[in-house]
Amino acid sequence: MEHYEVLEQIGKGSFGSALLVRHKHEKKLYVLKKIRLARQTGRTRRSAHQEMELISKIRNPFIVEYKDSWVEKGCYVCIVIGYCKGGDMAEAIKKANGVEFSEEKLCKWLVQLLMALEYLHASHILHRDVKCSNIFLTKDQDIRLGDFGLAKILTSDDLASSVVGTPSYMCPELLADIPYGSKSDIWSLGCCMYEMTALKPAFKAFDMQGLINRINRSIVAPLPAQYSTAFRSLVKSMLRKNPELRPSASDLLRQPLLQPYVQKVLLKLSFREHDTLPSESERRSSYPQQRKRTSGKSVSFGPSRFGVDQEDSVSSVKPVHTYLHRHRPVDLSANDTSRVVVRRPAVSSVVSNSSKYVPVRSNQPKSGGLLKPAVVTRRASLPISQKPAKGTKDSLYHPNIGILHQLNSPDVSVNSPRIDRIKFPLASYEEMPFIPVVRKKKGSSRGSYSPPPEPPLDCSITKDKFTLEPERETKSDLSDQNATAGASSRASSGASRRQRFDPSSYRQRAEALEGLLEFSARLLIDERYDELNVLLKPFGPGKVSPRETAIWLSKSFKESSPSNLEED
């Protein structure tokens, strides 16, 4: 700390603060992030140390620059990173004041963000908190992706499953209790690009239940018509509900629309490094070969496309410009009707990539029979088949991660609220959340994945912002699901739907406020300050959410989940 001069505080969060500092010898500005360790749980302290270790190993031109880190008197984890004079993307959207960004600028930003995510996913790292406030801009309006407090390092047999992140940027598979991989970051990036294009959030609702319903149905308004059809289709492809159909960062970088911007970025990087790009032979020797993708062949996403000789440590990952031009463009049209088969490995088998899904596309079925999809892997708490799908090959995913292999990856943020500790009702039984149903086919001992039918967009109508119209059920819907689970879900969701909050009723306001105080007191006694911060945040000055909504939401928490305050 003696090498830095503190200038001012530029940010403050639940777990620490951000200070603008100047290096005494370099005379250069940096940001000092101080994460408080005192009065924190063991998981939070481990997460702070993990963020310090992780960001010190990451080197990418579009990720915040790492300068230094240390532990101060055992009370703070201090991380020094590069200062971005342009602020964050959320501020840039507000300053735009309704004037849309040009398509050229958006494509440039998208390419830089995709290069950053490609680098992370190739190193088996999930960011898990990609949002506009974590995307920073330099004075030259270049992108720097930051805030790795929720990042997770995937091992060979691991997928992320904890509900962490910012709710409006969460992907459907995360909300549907399905293990997720790198495609969750692509969804979050799609939400960011939508917000940067339309200057408004992709998913917004008055309460958490409404937000979950919108995400589960992937309901978004059309993008402004001033942008090209190719660009709008690109953004829409990142918001596909099914992660199997969502493109990876590599797929998006190979799109013809983005190729000119990729070339510009590579040219700029080559001048910045005062060196020319390596020859094709040098590039092939410096980075593992990728498998060619052809129609009817196996398609895998993320790091599984690298050869088995790849070393998986972050320090071994080469610059992104060495492997972006090896494949033909991938069609991202929503009209792709190719058959998709999901390989399901055994529980103890090696997962082939950081993403959960490895689809196999085939234009022509095999002679003698039709292809049947295997069961989608769910969490360990849900029933799964122990038998691997027939024909599943050994994975190319390498288990060791070099230096990062020694790091644990607790599912807790050091600078974001613990969403997985807040118990809110998920989509009800009638609303058909994005949960696959396992059915048994006659004459076959293997389960198959049959996605539920897409519900109509107008099946739920909001009477006002406090009361939702229950949806009608059909007998065919009930026949496809477990009757016991459906009855319990309908009972809980129906009870909450029948409640109506009248802001003019002093009695109801008093009861709701009493419930809010009781709930806050219980959180305070249990020292769960992150959830308490989320609960009381709408009462601060200048907040958009009305107080009645916050009071009613806290009352719903109390009534719908009275025993949800136990520690994980």
From Swiss-Prot:
Species of origin: Arabidopsis thaliana (Mouse-ear cress)
Annotated protein name in UniProt: Serine/threonine-protein kinase Nek3
SUPFAM superfamilies given in the database record: Protein kinase-like (PK-like) (SSF56112)
Compositionally skewed regions (Low complexity) per UniProt: 483-496
Encoding gene (name): NEK3
PANTHER family: SERINE/THREONINE-PROTEIN KINASE NEK, SERINE_THREONINE-PROTEIN KINASE NEK1-RELATED
Domain of life of the source: Eukaryota
Biased composition regions of type Basic and acidic residues, renumbered to the chain: 461-478
Function: May be involved in plant development processes.
